[in-house]
Amino acid sequence: MQKKQADKRVFACINSTKIYTSDNGENDANNLVIGVLQRYRNRYILNAEELINALVKQKYTVKFLNFDVGCSLPTTAKLLEDVDVLISSHGNGIGDAIFMAPKTSVLSIDSRFYTEPWFTYVHTASGRRFYNFECVSSDCQVADI
């Protein structure tokens, strides 16, 4: 029974992941893979679609991730292994970036009226660059549900 539930989690996580590339086929192995981690309850990226379109227009490969479906740790690690830059709202999803390679970057969008430095310490100690974008405008803040 437990294996069956684990298999469902693996496939739900993989099936919810979408890869976006430019239509003209100019994306290649030398281009950065940018992961956009979206949450759907609290702290989600309000303009995720615009963000993805802008990145694809610049010829980046975008991996659109949704871990709210209940990803297992091995699946999460597999999905993040080729991500060069992870963009996510501040929260537990940022912690998943520990599965990214050293010398990669994490961009945390903090729209909660406060900031916590905990993730900064973990990622910089692991050899990743960590940037915190603190949104102070009500235009980009999402209320708790």
Predicted regions and their residues:
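The feature primarily captures lumenal catalytic ectodomains
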Residues: 1-145
